[in-house]
Amino acid sequence: MVDTKNPGDKTLSVSPSKTLTLKRGVEQGTVRQSFSHGRTKQVVVEKRGKRRVGGDGPADAPAAPAPVAAAKPAPVRAPMSRPPQSSHRGGGSGVVLRTLTEDERTARASALADARIRDEEERKAAEAELARRNSKEGIEQAEREAAEARKKAEEERHRQDEEAKRKAELEAKKRFGEEEAKKAAAAAPAKTTAATTATAAKPGAPARAPGVAADATDEDEGPRQIRRGPGGAARPVVAPKPTAKPAPAKQRGRLTLVTALSADDVRERSIASFRRRTQRLKGHQSNEPKEKLVREVIIPEAITIQELANRMAERAVDVIRMLMKQGQMVKITDVIDADTAQLIAEELGHSVKRVAASDVEEGLFDIVDDATDTEPRSPVVTVMGHVDHGKTSLLDALRHANVVSGEAGGITQHIGAYQVTSPESGKKITFIDTPGHAAFTAMRARGAKVTDIVVLVVAADDGVMPQTIEAINHAKAAKVPVIVAINKIDKQDAKPERVRTELLQYGIQVESLGGDVVDVEVSAKNKTNLDKLLEMIALQAELLDLKTNTERPAEGTVIEAKLDRGRGPVATVLVQRGTLRVGDIIVAGAEMGRVRALISDQGVTLTEAGPSVPVEVLGFNGPPEAGDRMAVVDSEARARQVTSYRAHQKREKSASAVSGLRGSLEQMMSQLKTTGRKDFPLIIKADVAGSLEAILGSLEKLGTDEVTARILHAGVGGISESDVTLAEGFNAAIIGFNVRAHKEAAAAAKRNGIEIRYYNIIYDLVDDVKKAMSGLLAPTLRETMLGNALILEVFNISKVGKVAGCRVTDGSVERGANVRLIRDNVVVHEGKLSTLKRFKDEVKEVQSGQECGMAFENYGDMRAGDIIECYRVETIQRSL
């Protein structure tokens, strides 16, 4: 702006009414600096305004040495020591700075207030940021930000490295130029001085006032405007670039939240260095001798080399090397026996514990009870004897029941268990009824094993019979006392004394003959002396002192088992020790289950069954075999272990038996060629396991060298469609004992022509199978001699052929009979007579002494003097 009143005055003014005055050169204020991670700091800031120096063009000449003064920082604070009245000097000096107007002061105060408010907000935001970082979400956010910061720092480091590399190249070029300059300076020192001065202060640099610092406007961004006098053009001067800062040290160690928030940049050990140190320490430790670890190695009956090495924590190569020293060439997967494994383990310094697969059954049975916890129990009495000697009738009389009428054919074919209460003592007695037939030997043996007392029933009119002797042997094998009950004394031909005498031959000496065996004469029909029999049983039980613990887990024996279509597998169990309760987990043979229901012999549902109580148990997975021992286990896992072991043993046993019987294919074919043995295929289904066992035993006895009964499948339960399919494949017959075929199975059998036979008496079944097997036997051929004839002359007839004229020398000759042609006592032909004529008539028979003509079928080599022997062959059917 130009003042029209004073054209020569260069003083700036805002309005014509006011003159500009020079304000104090230094202004003080406070500024709050913000650092990373929420740190702030309040500092005092001094601001120096720019001084404008007016005048003509020549006035700039004295200001030329200003750069030399600008390099000294001492005169920076010189204006502060000036008195305030220096600003009121006359305008003759020509230098007057403008003062701020009221609007500018207001705007400046408002800007400072806004800056303070902004600083306060930034401080609060930093505190909130710090609190957020301390929280869980803040920590995660901080980790992400730290990762971004690491990325940016890495990029910045790369950029600075590139910048440093570029500057190093420039510096090298500069040094090369300085060396050239030094060479030139040796020739022209004045020129070098001028060059140095020109380098320190470029020509045309702005003149600075003595009181203004050289870096007063270093913070200003952008080019500075410098006046060069009236009429001088202002040109921008670019600020010198700051020198490159050294690249920050490489971040070492893992960057965590703590290191990211820490203010100090601490140099730490790198992760790679730490890992190298750890590896060195491990290497030193591996060189040290290790202490041998002695382990307890569990060795089963058979074990692989790999498994043995794993259990010993040894290398399998070492185990193989030891075996090779013993002369055994083995692989890592080979199986060795327990003795070899024990030798290897002991040689390597380990202790050995031998186990067997049968160890799973340890603690299952025969647990010794404490004598203080035992209580008296009821005796178990087994009634044994020959068939039709009145065993079941005697039990019916004791139980006041009628079981005999329910048995097919009036004979007992099932083993039964019942409880009877003694009328005098009120104590219960458990009776087991066994079949007396020869087929039920296994049932009688089972009854003898679980019993305490054996009642041997002998008919007074029949005496000792084969099954009576067998029952005596079972009782002796079980080492149980015997009470002889001589039944049917009501008959007229009863001879009790003969029975007592016959028993002496088999080691049974009754008390009346000086022995210790009790005998009672009873009559089941008239109920004679039944109370005396019960009294003798109770007395014998007192002598045995039968006691057991009722609170222990139950043990027992499966008397009988069957597969009921409505109830599933049902087992008749005699509890021998402990108490069996509903819900117990039980194991019997290869079958397991949980007790769902307990049913007494009277059909009453029970919640528990104590010792000597026979019950039907529902809940098995499958029907167990009769005679299996039953036990209660603590868990299903233990039950599965026991049953899997028993099933494995059962499979191995059956496989070995089958392989032993079958042999090789060549042996079987040669046997068929030599013996011509035939099989009679059968599928047998029975109601209970005991009956099935008796049937199989009886059929095995029917086999001979020529024919045998081949049992394709035998099981408990009804006849199913799978049985019919199996029978169709092998052309077998199906036999059902006290069972029936399902509706679908019966229809399939009728459609495919499969024969199904039903039986309820075991002897009828055995007899029919015996007849059918007899039909497979080759019949017996028997020759009957008829007579001999001598050939007198041989005639050749064109229509008939050669005809021999003969005389019957012995017996008779019949047409159609078998003949032999004997020449010189050698049979040269066997065949049949085709023609027998006497004179010209065909006759059926020619008697001795008569002449006749005979011709053979398909044979004509006959000569005079040959003898014709005539005989008849009879076929006789064989039977087993």
UniProtKB/Swiss-Prot annotation:
Q: Which UniProt keywords apply?
A: Cytoplasm, GTP-binding, Initiation factor, Nucleotide-binding, Protein biosynthesis
- Annotated region G4: the residues are 487-490
User: Which region ranges are annotated with the description Disordered?
Assistant: 1-251
Q: Which organism is it from?
A: Rhodopseudomonas palustris (strain BisB18)
Instruction: Give the start-end ranges of region G3.
Output: 433-436
Region (G1) residue ranges read 385-392
Its recorded name reads Translation initiation factor IF-2
> Can you tell me which residues bind GTP?
385-392, 433-437, 487-490
InterPro entries according to UniProt: EF-G-like_DII (IPR053905), EFTu-like_2 (IPR004161), IF2_assoc_dom_bac (IPR013575), IF2_II (IPR044145), IF2_N (IPR006847), P-loop_NTPase (IPR027417), Small_GTP-bd (IPR005225), T_Tr_GTP-bd_dom (IPR000795)
| Cellular-component GO terms for this entry | cytosol
Region spans: G2: 410-414
Instruction: Check the record and name the PANTHER family matching this protein.
Output: TR-TYPE G DOMAIN-CONTAINING PROTEIN, TRANSLATION INITIATION FACTOR IF-2-RELATED
Family stated for the protein in its record: Belongs to the TRAFAC class translation factor GTPase superfamily. Classic translation factor GTPase family. IF-2 subfamily.
